[in-house]
Each structure stands twice: as C-alpha cells, then as structure tokens.
Amino acid sequence: MTFAEKGKHVRSVLQLSQEKFAIMLGVSFATVNRLENGHAVPSYATMEKFASLCKEHNISFD
C-alpha cells in the first residue's frame, strides 16, 4: 500500500476533509492533496505525525 493509499484510508476512517487532515498533520491542504495524488513524497516529520495519528486512533496497516 502506498503512502497515498494509506493517507486516503486514514482520512476516510477518521471522516476528515483534506483541510482538517492537513491541520492535524501540520501541513497545507495543497500538500495533503499532492500526497494523496502521488505527486509528492512525505517529509520525515509528516511521516512521524502520520504514524502518531494512526497509533492514537488504533489504525494499523499490518
């Protein structure tokens, strides 16, 4: 599963708009949009926040 697919899945599970998801990750709406469309690679800091968010909401990709 790509990061784009994981991002869309987590956002769907949490029922968040791209705007609200961006706020939770500390990035812009445009960044979330590019990440979900596979046009960008997440920074290490974004990946850490994403992992923390998944852990906080008991979302696993195992």
Predicted regions and their residues:
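A detector for short, charged/polar N-terminal pre-domain segments
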Residues: 1-2
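Solvent-exposed, flexible loop/coil residues
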Residues: 5-7, 33, 45
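Short basic helix-loop element that most often maps to the first helix and adjoining turn
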Residues: 5-20, 49, 57
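Short alpha-helical DNA-recognition segment
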Residues: 15-33
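DNA major-groove recognition helix of helix-turn-helix/homeodomain DNA-binding modules
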Residues: 44-62
